[in-house]
């Protein structure tokens, strides 16, 4: 199963990248760890949205068959605040592989989506995954696209129904043409932006959404052994 957590805190960089955390997760049976952190490398990113008092500082993903409560406990100890979910992962565009523990050469944008009041979950999923996916791929310069639908909450106040990760060129932090893949054509940029806004509005992703620009790190935990 894939677990995902939103974390807040002033010591996330130190706590999340500590070797000890990887050892503890591996000891629980975790096979893979992904850290998406809002760090200095993505500080220039212009697209940021938050529904919380403080923006999310990191999104952590853990692949593990069980021991969900123990994983939640480890990450709770690493942060000031944690929200966690069990998710069902879909990969319309599989992200490129990167070296173990090395920053991916990308702006990794994370979005927390919520079902609008009055909309049925099945209809929301249809509009998002069936209708919008193609629009997102055709209007943006994404080279990695992962959709994570929440199937269970792991913490209180974990208010999200899906978490989306999209990888963009680093230039997309400040250049709309690099973000939308419009090749410097202002008219094409406008067309793509309009199409994207129209599509996101059909399933509530234009409001009540968090957007977090991050750096992406992936660790293979299958060979990690506790040192004591």
Language model feature labels by segment:
Residues 1-228:
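Macromolecular interaction modules
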């Amino acid at each position: 199963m894939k677990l995902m957590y939103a974390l807040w805190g002033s010591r996330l960089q130190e706590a999340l990248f500590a070797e000890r955390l990887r050892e503890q997760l591996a000891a629980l049976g975790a096979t893979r760890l992904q850290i998406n952190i809002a760090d200095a490398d993505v500080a220039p990113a212009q697209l940021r949205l938050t529904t919380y008092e403080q923006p999310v500082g990191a999104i952590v993903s853990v692949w593990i068959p069980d021991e969900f409560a123990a994983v939640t406990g480890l990450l709770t100890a690493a942060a000031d605040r944690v929200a966690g979910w069990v998710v069902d992962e879909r990969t319309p565009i599989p992200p490129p592989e990167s070296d173990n523990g090395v920053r991916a050469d990308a702006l990794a944008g994370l979005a927390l989506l919520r079902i609008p009041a009055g909309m049925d979950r099945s209809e929301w999923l249809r509009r998002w995954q069936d209708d919008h996916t193609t629009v997102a791929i055709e209007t943006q310069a994404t080279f990695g696209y992962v959709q994570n639908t929440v199937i269970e909450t792991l913490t209180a106040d974990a208010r999200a129904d899906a978490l989306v990760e999209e990888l963009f060129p680093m230039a997309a932090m400040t250049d709309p043409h690099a973000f939308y893949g419009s090749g410097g054509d202002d008219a094409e940029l406008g067309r793509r932006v309009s199409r994207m806004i129209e599509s996101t509005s059909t399933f509530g992703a234009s409001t009540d959404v968090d957007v977090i620009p991050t750096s992406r790190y992936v660790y293979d935990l299958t060979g990690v052994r506790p040192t004591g």
